[in-house]
């Protein structure tokens, strides 16, 4: 999932990233491109789900392209009900892309938490979708 091993102190909870104004709130983010060089993540201004004027956006040059956006380590120490909330949007009414959320555990194993599959959603309104992923005592809930 990551292009190497991330070292250093993890972020503590609560952890938030809003990309406010098209800028980073937290310094440790990485991108791994898995397609053509024309496809990329970028920080965008004036486009946001929460009204703060920014987001991280992915623009694909090909339907086969993919990329990974990852954060630094986040400590879940002491968290009983870990929750991840994120918003996605496709500007295509007939979108077929996927947003797949993974975590990497301290033992380096990976766990898929959630998939937002636009090919299975009605995207005719092209609105923002907010997804909440909650991990409760080994029960995983994904609500879109």
Task: Please annotate each region the language model reported.
Residues 10-63:
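Extracellular glycan-recognition surfaces and repeat-rich motifs
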């Amino acid at each position: 999932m990551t292009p190497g091993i991330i070292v250093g102190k993890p972020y503590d909870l609560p952890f938030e990233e809003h990309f406010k104004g098209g800028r980073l709130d937290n310094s440790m983010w990485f991108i791994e491109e898995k397609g053509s060089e024309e496809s990329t993540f970028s920080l965008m201004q004036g486009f946001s789900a929460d009204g703060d004027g920014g987001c991280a956006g992915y623009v694909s040059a090909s339907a086969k392209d993919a990329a990974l956006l990852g954060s630094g380590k986040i400590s879940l120490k002491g968290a009983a009900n870990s929750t991840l909330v994120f918003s996605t949007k496709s500007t295509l009414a007939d979108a077929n892309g996927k947003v797949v959320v993974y975590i990497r555990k301290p033992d380096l194993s990976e766990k898929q938490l959630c998939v937002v599959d636009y090919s299975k959603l009605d995207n005719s309104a092209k609105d923002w979708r907010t997804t909440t992923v909650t991990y409760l005592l080994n029960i995983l809930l994904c609500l879109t």
